[in-house]
Amino acid sequence: LLKLQNGRWYPTAMIMANGSILVVGGENGSNGPAVPTLEILPQVGPVLTMEWLQRTDPYNLYPFLAVLPSGGIFVAYYNEAIILDEVDFTTSKVLPNMPGSVSNPAGGRTYPLEGTMVLLPQYAPYTDPLGVLLCGGSTPFVGGGLAIDNCVTTTPESANPVWTVERMVIYPQVLSNEAYAYKCCSLRQEYCPV
């Protein structure tokens, strides 16, 4: 029987390379206090408190997670991104902050600001670094949150990753359907499906 050690709403769960389930973040009930921890299922130890989840609450719900080819875990939350060690979950790399909207750099990509993320396709012989694409989001709701009309890409495993802003080719909107965002978010042909 699998059971969470911390009750949580709005977490992200991901199957790790070893088959375990990583559960990250959330709140204790709808609009409840933050649960700034991560845990593994089946249980292998205590929950681990993450400073970056505490610091960016409440703009880090449903953080974006991906297992990287190098074995690390890419995590994007609010307007920040890191790579975690897949064994002890310490931060092995801090990426530069993601650009937000042109008029408000404080814009974020994770819930409740509501952006989305996908891994970019790789092609044989798979020697190029893995890319990630994050689209949409909004500025914080204080003062009337506005949708972010761009996408950002990076290659997290590069020696010095940088974020590249990709302008959406349609009007600004918060995108919840990644397939649609993927087709419409970039003028760069290599990101367009055939």
Model segments located where?
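Asp-box/WD-like beta-propeller blade repeats and closely related beta-sheet repeat scaffolds
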Residues: 1-63
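Beta-propeller domains
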Residues: 56-193
